[in-house]
UniProtKB/Swiss-Prot annotation:
Residues 674-850 form the PCI domain. This is Eukaryotic translation initiation factor 3 subunit C. It is found in: Cytoplasm. It comes from Xenopus tropicalis. One of its GO terms (molecular function) is translation initiation factor binding. Keywords: Cytoplasm, Initiation factor, Protein biosynthesis. Residues 8-21 have a biased composition (Low complexity). Belongs to the eIF-3 subunit C family. Coiled coil: none annotated. One of its GO terms (cellular component) is eukaryotic 48S preinitiation complex. Residues 1-37, 154-308, 885-922 are annotated as: Disordered. The gene is eif3c.
Length: 922
């Protein structure tokens, strides 16, 4: 018999269950009233009427749980999906939220999720490890959350100020615990009270800490809830006994309940009382803890509050036992013990450096000699270099300062002790650290320390923001670095080998070649204006950088046995010549070295140095007015479109997919520090202006030449981009200025061309960056006038029968000898079919230039000839005859026409006839 139909006490129900009773048969047919028989599943469930608020909030909390789980495993795709669902669920609960207010747990999630996404976004290494879907979802979710949180700025700010749980959440947790306890009571009816209590005590509180995540304050609250759990269970027992008295039969308990307004108010009142009791218990517990502390204080000494995180003052480790005699062998043995831990896993590198400093102090206190001091200093500097195991990690400021100071101290000791010899060839067994009767011998290489120090300085500059004050402060250390290198150079010149001297010379060159010597430049400009005594004083102040570079490089040319050091020295020497406008010396050195023939076999840093040298050579040629040489020097770098990468000044984003992380790290280590960069906008402007001065006259001379070649593809590309624009406004960028100037030069309008190239905006961007800006501007104006004259003559020569050179000089503001020289060159090179009448200073045109109609007819005839030739070849191929079009009998007519053109001059223009005869034997 089902126990739900049994009435009476618990003992009666148990006795009825023990016996086998027979159910009475119902009276009537099969369609009569059947007794209500519930299944086992229905026995364990309870129908409860839930409010809309509970349903909506439960939906929100379930979604929040899913989001937090996804946050733990860094599943951004799942986070994004659930966040979108959460937004939809919140919109559904809008009516309830308007009445009750935004729930605290919802604000907590928005705040936590925002902090979590910001932390992920700043973690660059973690972002690189994400797959594509997660990275995309992270970016999308971050944007959506920032936009979504604008509506909740005030609640989120209030929550961040006081992230404690609100009373509403406590009430919600009490409701959940009450509901769970009541459901357990109903399902376990018929059991003994002792069994029920045991089950209630052992049951885990499922609803407790429902919304708690990570905060320490909330963890404390959860612990206090654990302490109060017993009292909550007692309250649930009393509520359960009250519920049992309400129902007269078991079946009535499981029928749907109708809740009236009075019952609801009573339930709310009961919840408030529970919350008050809970708060009272917390206050009481705190008071009891305070009393216990007072009792402890009365019984013993006073307790003192100590702030967490205060570092304990550690005693310095004892290097030697008390009473030990400090001798050089003992110190060397201790030094070897410290060095044995070097490089091992788990070794505290900072502590190791401190131990070495402490050992150096002990050796100095006991006057153990300079040999021991030098050996310890060598190991201190080496330990500073080994502090960062990762090659890409740069040295911190305090470590860098210690490194410089240690190297300075080491050099001081070496200069003070002339009887000391150091070198890598000295073995540890043959070292002499303390016997002053013989020369001191220490194993070590000062040059290796200097080179590593220079590399560390480069890494520091590479990893510092170039637009910050920190970069300027770090750059000031270069003076100390150069001082260390200069002192090492003096020491190695006395005691070093030729190979070591070449290496230290190269370090000195690398810190000198890219710097413009303003003092030498000023002395050069003021030569003849100063008295002889002032000149002698200026020469004695400091060695001219040109003399220094010449002396260092020539020593390397003569003594070096490795190709790499000699190649770097030659390139730096050329760069320095070009930087100081010594064009011919730089050009001759480049041509004599033949570096352009085998530079592709050099390592990448040397190739970067070669590219920088060629660029500086081209800029120097431009400043000197050698436009064609400047264009040729810059052509390879600019035509590739990768000038930034080839010069070692950054990586291109479009090539980032072609390299993995290791290759990217290697290429970043090859980058040149910012203070050594070449201005890329200046470089491009110099190249485009050079191309304009060469290309525009050439285009005018070969306007109707179908086979004309392009001097600069990049310049033509810029022209096409300018022509494709539907609406042309005033030029803004540097490229637009050059394109506008080119169009003006095509028309022979040199003044407009000059105004586009030389104006206030272009001066600020480009021309003022040159040391002698005014001289460069005057050179540019002169070149624009000359090339505009050539372009004008090419374009309008068919219009004139003759023209006076005085008129041309007035048009382009050139002297008559200059105009005469330009026109004479054009006639000699067969670019202009004309002759000069010296008495009248007139240019007489020969009139052999074809008109536009004749040029069109020539082009049509040429295209028809090509068409006929192609048709004849196709016909011969189909017929099986391979004699070709050139073997046919009608060739004599064309030969006669070509002979006429050769003898009479014909109507072919300028040098086009000669080019045609050389390219095809028609």
């Amino acid at each position: 018999m089902s126990r739900f139909f049994a009435t009476g006490s618990d003992s009666e129900s148990e006795s009825s269950l023990s016996g086998d009773e027979i159910l009475p048969k119902p009276v009537g047919g099969t369609f009569g009233k059947q007794p209500i028989i519930l299944s086992d599943d229905e026995e364990d469930t309870k129908r409860v009427v839930r409010s809309a608020k509970d349903k909506r909030f439960e939906e929100l909390t379930n979604l929040i749980k899913t989001i937090r789980n996804a946050m733990k495993i860094r599943d951004m795709t799942k986070c994004l999906e659930e966040f979108e669902q959460l937004g939809k669920a919140f919109i559904k609960a809008k009516n309830i939220v308007d009445k009750e207010g935004v729930p605290r747990f919802y604000i907590r999630l928005l705040s936590d999720l925002e902090d979590y996404l910001n932390e992920l976004w700043e973690d660059k290494e973690g972002k690189k490890k994400m797959n594509k879907n997660n990275a995309k979802a992270l970016s999308t979710l971050r944007q959506k959350l920032r936009k979504y949180n604008r509506d909740f700025e005030a609640p989120i700010a209030a929550y961040k100020q006081n992230p404690e749980e609100s009373a509403d959440e406590d009430q919600e947790k009490d409701e959940d615990s009450e509901a769970s306890s009541s459901s357990d009571d109903d399902s376990d009816e018929g059991m003994s009270a002792s069994k029920f209590l045991k089950k209630a005590d052992s049951a885990p509180p499922e609803s407790r800490s429902k919304f708690l995540k990570k905060e320490e304050a909330e963890d404390e609250e959860s612990s206090s809830d654990d302490e109060d759990w017993g009292s909550d269970s007692d309250e649930s027992d009393s509520d359960e006994s009250d519920d049992e008295n309400k129902y007269t039969s078991m079946a009535s308990r499981f029928l749907k309940k109708t809740v009236n307004e009075g019952d609801r108010q009573a339930a709310e009142k009961k919840k408030e009382e529970k919350a008050k009791k809970k708060q009272h218990r917390k206050v009481k517990r705190k008071d009891e803890e305070g009393e216990e502390e007072e009792d402890d204080n009365e019984g013993g000494g006073e307790w003192e509050k100590v702030k967490g995180g205060v570092p304990l003052v550690k005693e310095k480790p004892k290097m030697f036992a008390k009473g030990t005699e400090i001798t050089p062998p003992i110190v060397v043995k201790k030094l070897n013990e410290i060095l044995q831990a070097r490089g091992k896993k788990g070794t505290d590198r900072a502590a190791q450096i401190d131990l070495l400093h402490l050992l150096a102090g002990i050796a100095e206190e006991n006057n153990l000699g300079q040999g021991i001091a030098v050996k310890i200093k060598f190991n201190i500097v080496a330990s500073l270099y080994d502090y960062n195991t990762n090659l890409a990690t740069y040295m911190k400021a305090d470590m860098w300062k210690k490194c410089l100071d240690s190297i300075h101290d080491l050099l001081d000791i070496l200069f003070a002790n002339s009887n000391m010899f150091i070198g890598e060839h000295i073995s540890e067994d043959s070292e002499n650290l303390s016997n002053t009767d013989q020369p001191l011998r220490v194993r070590g290489c000062i040059l290796t320390l200097i080179e590593r120090m220079d590399e560390e300085f480069t890494k520091i500059m590479q990893n510092t923001d170039p637009h910050s004050q920190e970069y300027v402060d770090n750059l000031k250390d270069e003076a100390r670095v150069c001082e260390v290198i200069e002192r090492a150079q003096k020491y190695l010149q006395e005691k070093g080998s030729t190979e070591e001297v070449c290496r230290v010379y190269l370090r000195r060159i690398m810190h000198t070649y890219y710097k413009f010597d303003y003092k030498a430049h000023q002395r050069q400009l003021s030569t003849g204006q100063e008295s002889k005594s002032e000149q002698d004083q200026a020469e004695n102040e400091a060695e001219d950088s040109a003399i220094l570079m010449d002396r260092l490089c020539k020593y390397i040319y003569a003594k070096d046995r490795t190709d790499r050091i000699r190649t770097c020295a030659i390139l730096c020497h050329i760069y320095h010549h070009a930087l100081h406008n010594r064009w011919f010396q730089a050009r001759d050195l480049m041509l004599m070295s033949h570096l352009q023939d085998n530079i592709q076999h050099a390592d990448p840093p040397v190739q970067i140095l070669y590219n920088r040298t060629m660029v500086q050579l081209g800029i120097c040629a431009f400043r000197q007015g050698m436009i064609r040489d400047a264009h040729n020097a810059l052509l390879d770098i600019q035509s590739s479109g990768r000038a930034k990468e080839l010069l070692g000044q950054g990586l291109l984003m479009r090539t980032m997919q072609e390299r993995n992380q290791e290759q990217e790290k290697i290429e970043k280590r090859r980058q040149i520090p910012f203070h050594m960069h070449i201005n890329l906008e200046l470089l491009e402007c110099v190249y485009l202006v050079s191309a304009m001065l060469l290309e525009i006259p050439y285009m005018a001379a070969h306007e109707f030449d179908a086979r004309r070649r392009m001097i600069s593809k990049q310049f033509h590309h810029q022209l096409r981009v300018g022509e494709r624009q539907p609406l042309l406004g005033p030029p803004e960028s540097m490229r637009e200025h050059v394109v506008a100037a080119s169009k003006a030069m095509k028309m022979g309008d040199w003044k407009t061309c000059k105004n586009f190239i030389i104006n206030e905006k272009m001066n600020g961007k480009v021309w003022d960056l040159f040391p002698e800006a005014e001289r460069v501007r005057s050179m540019l104006i002169r070149k624009i006038q000359e090339e505009s004259l050539r372009t004008y003559l090419f374009t309008y020569s068919s219009v004139y029968d003759s023209i006076r050179m005085g008129i041309l000089g007035d048009m382009f503001q050139l002297e008559i000898p200059t105009v005469h020289s330009i026109i004479s060159k054009m006639i000699i090179n067969e670019e202009l079919m004309a002759s000069l009448d010296q008495p009248t200073q007139t240019v007489v045109m020969h009139g052999t230039e074809p008109s536009s109609l004749q040029n069109t007819a020539l082009q049509l005839a040429e295209k028809l000839g090509n068409l006929v030739e192609n048709n004849e070849r196709i016909f011969d191929h189909k017929q099986g005859s391979y004699g070709g079009y050139f073997n046919r009998g009608d060739r004599g007519d064309r030969d006669q026409k070509d002979q006429y053109q050769r003898k009479e001059g014909g109507y072919m223009r300028r040098g086009y006839r000669r080019d045609q005869q050389g390219q095809s034997n028609y």
